[in-house]
Amino acid sequence: MSKFVFVTGGVVSSIGKGIVAASLGRLLKSRGYSVSILKLDPYLNVDPGTMSPFQHGEVFVTEDGAETDLDLGHYERFTDTAMTRLNSVTTGSIYQAVINKERRGSYNGGTVQVIPHITGEIRERIHRVAANSNADIIITEIGGTVGDIESLPFLEAIREFKNDVNRNDVAYIHVTLLPFIKTSGEIKTKPTQHSVKELRSIGIQPDLLVCRSDKSINEGLKKKLSGFCGVNIKSVIEALDADSIYSVPLALKKEGLCKETLKYLELEDKECDLKNWEALIHNLRNPGDPIKVALVGKYIELGDAYLSVVEALRHACIEKKASLDLHWVSAEMIEKGSAETYLKEVDAIVVPGGFGNRGVNGKISAIKFAREKKIPFLGLCLGMQCAVIEWARNVANLPDASSSELNPDTPNPVIHLLPEQEDVVDLGGTMRLGVYPCRLTNNTTGKKLYDEDVIYERHRHRYEFNNYYKQSFLNSGYKISGTSPDGRLVELIELENHPYFLACQYHPEFLSRPGKPHPLFQGLIKASQEKLTQSN
């Protein structure tokens, strides 16, 4: 039977609950326990799939095609465990399920209320993850901040949850902030005391406090928090600001987070094996020469919009003992100026996914610059589509080529709508989503990098390469490195006579892990290092 850990946050938003949950997952897994982590998000959207990246950041896609919160990416990267659509729950999806049940008559004519029906549905979702994953420990992160109106149903649900199981099957962790007041030179505990008081008023007594701070917390402060918040002093965990999110598990291990959690769950504190993780942090803190990577996008004002891409680059740099020097380049600024102005000093160029016309011509200019100047290049999803358009216009004698998404009237739609998407009206959850197989072509860079005949990658798109133009592309020097097993869909392309020029229709960034970098990102960094060595 599974045990359950609930992670709440107080005082301020963006306190780091997701990293705490993911770090605890890593620590538990290092002790031999299986873990699954789910996120309860208190917004009314059914999922983040239709939300602006400026509002929500990246949409993380799971193996089974769910469009989820970016925290699920942290969960997967830290625990190296695949999550599913069950691991992402929103207020919108809960209300939708309850209303659908009411319409079907599932409540036998009863009055449908927040308590017990909404809270009951939330508890059911948590139990469903336990049943589906069969994990030893289920960690649940509750989005928002204690005191927010929209979080109340979730907090009530996790309060009720302890009645579904034995008390020693549940642990409550509250992540909070201890602000340092510069004028007085003091760390203040009062905001945390009030946050815990608010949590207690709902009926939840936290078992552990994880205290975020940029200053070290002495024993006196821990004793004070223990007394005012009713938490064992050993369960007051210091969480100092870290140099990297990947160093957080080691810091929390030192503070005893995992040991104390296991104590409340009455589970054995097994021997912890973090040798590989420690080696990872050593390489991270002792990098070699920097690699200047330009990320050319349309949402660069919010770095979280490309979170998995950045982490995948970081994983590859750690593996190759390089330092990541990331240059955020606005595709729209390239349109107003020139690609050379923004890209002449970089060692590699990445064009990530996206939607819509804005910034596309800037991306195409960046790709042309990478191709002509022999700069290692990787295109992802829309990045591949832009690479196809660039080649068609500048090499394959199709100057008016475009995508039917960007220009429905183009006479040469080298990128067109997938046939199964033609009658789709709704936006949410209707794209080609989730894992699909890709057969790699022999004697290609792609095949060499993966060293597999068939790979499985995650997708999120409606448009694809138009096979009507396949032969003209092949004749003009393009290589198709990977297709769907039936050969119908082009998934990976590359150029010969270039240090590294690959573009894929899928999202390889979702499968990159610390210590297990994705082959396409690893290949990009390696090619950049080799080019730098040759130029020196």
Swiss-Prot record:
UniProt binding sites for Mg(2+): D71, E141
Subunit structure and binding partners: Homotetramer.
Enzyme superclass (EC): ligase
Positions of UTP binding: S13, K188, T189, K190, P191, T192, Q193, K224
Activity regulation text: Allosterically activated by GTP, when glutamine is the substrate; GTP has no effect on the reaction when ammonia is the substrate. The allosteric effector GTP functions by stabilizing the protein conformation that binds the tetrahedral intermediate(s) formed during glutamine hydrolysis. Inhibited by the product CTP, via allosteric rather than competitive inhibition.
Sites where the protein binds ATP: S14, I15, G16, K17, G18, I19, D71
UniProt-annotated binding residues for CTP: S13, D148, I149, E150, K188, T189, K190, P191, T192, Q193, K224
Keyword Ligase set for record: yes
Family of this protein: Belongs to the CTP synthase family.
Keywords tagged on the record: ATP-binding, Glutamine amidotransferase, Ligase, Magnesium, Metal-binding, Nucleotide-binding, Pyrimidine biosynthesis
Further information: CTPSs have evolved a hybrid strategy for distinguishing between UTP and CTP. The overlapping regions of the product feedback inhibitory and substrate sites recognize a common feature in both compounds, the triphosphate moiety. To differentiate isosteric substrate and product pyrimidine rings, an additional pocket far from the expected kinase/ligase catalytic site, specifically recognizes the cytosine and ribose portions of the product inhibitor.
Gene Ontology, cellular component aspect: cytosol
Keyword Iron: no
Pathway where this protein functions: Pyrimidine metabolism; CTP biosynthesis via de novo pathway; CTP from UDP: step 2/2
Job description of the protein: Catalyzes the ATP-dependent amination of UTP to CTP with either L-glutamine or ammonia as the source of nitrogen. Regulates intracellular CTP levels through interactions with the four ribonucleotide triphosphates.
Any one GO BP annotation for this protein: 'de novo' CTP biosynthetic process
Name of the molecule in the record: CTP synthase
Annotated NCBIfam families: PRK05380.1, PyrG
Enzyme Commission number(s) from the entry: 6.3.4.2
Residues holding L-glutamine: G354, L382, G383, M384, Q385, E405, R462
Active site: C381, H507, E509
Catalytic activity: UTP + L-glutamine + ATP + H2O = CTP + L-glutamate + ADP + phosphate + 2 H(+); L-glutamine + H2O = L-glutamate + NH4(+); UTP + NH4(+) + ATP = CTP + ADP + phosphate + 2 H(+)
Gene3D superfamilies: 3.40.50.880, P-loop containing nucleotide triphosphate hydrolases
Underlying gene: pyrG
